[in-house]
Amino acid sequence: GGPMYYLETGLRQRNLSWLAKPMGLFYAMSIVVGCLGIGNMFQSNQAFQQFVFITGGDASFFVDKGWLFGFILAGIVALVIIGGIKGIARVTSKLVPFMTLTYVIGALLVVILNAHKVPWAISAILTEAFNPSAMSGGMLGIMILGFQRAAFSNEAGIGSAAIAHATVKTKEPVSEGFVGLMEPFIDTVVICTLTALVILTTVYEPAMANEGIQGIALTSQAFSSTLSWSVLPLSFIAILFAFSTILSWSYYGSKGWTYIIGESIWAESFFKISFCFFIALGCMINLSAVLDFSDALIFITAIPNIFGLYVLAPVIKSELVNYQKRLHSGEIQHYRSSPD
């Protein structure tokens, strides 16, 4: 499942057969290349930066040994993805709830301890976003940057999550769509807002004075400035976040790859080996290069999917209306009453 399949099938149903297969292939090729950026090199790079931070920073033994960390991480990932979607699901289903809950609790604790700065932080977000200078000169640039980082945060519009949701066994695809709608809310509205408040109420001013603070290092310093003991737990969670994201994107990329050349154990093995190589590569290059590469790949991946969303919008609306009618009529029973 995923965009390459619903683009091909959906466009045929919309009498656009001549465009169906090319758009499916366009998306498949985009997700194969795109998974190497946002879901691979960027994640391994940030995991390595966090590992260096907790092992001494610039004085760390590993500061110039990204290759070593990269190959170790690639080896661990390889052990999991060899098991396919079941192995990936087994690991991520245990990691993600634990990581999310722990991170939210830690962020709330930092915000509460700096509660006196929260009104200023919220005011700064609103005033800096909508002041006249921002809306004139820098508005377009900031909007572009915002869209790029939002895509990193929740993958909305990219279509990657649809590949994972397609593996779910359900008789009602619409209900699975509702589950998918919760993901951007949790990622962006909850997690990212909390992270922004943590940074703004702790290390915002020093970070602005030193342009070298960016990425995961900025968040780490924000937490450690209030909770000195949080460095190791947060670093562990950040590395696990990167690890689980890499696992998920390995599956997305493999499905795009097999869509292009067909299902076979050799095809999947070749992709998995190549994917693991890029994990190591991501640890060896600087963050700005990874970000530029990833931003370009996100844009390319989103093009065919967003096109498909607009073209197939009437189909989605029809399915939603039909689902709501059956739900309200009682035809769809979500819960069974237990016998007395």
Locate each region found by the language model:
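C-terminal membrane-solvent junction of multi-pass transporters and transport-like membrane proteins
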Residues: 12-23, 238, 242-280, 311-340
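Select transmembrane alpha-helical segments in multipass membrane proteins
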Residues: 16-33, 69-72, 133-153, 190, ...
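Membrane-interface loop-to-helix entry segments
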Residues: 23, 27, 31, 44-51, ...
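Extracellular/periplasmic helix-exit of transmembrane alpha-helices
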Residues: 107-124, 135-137, 167-168, 182, ...
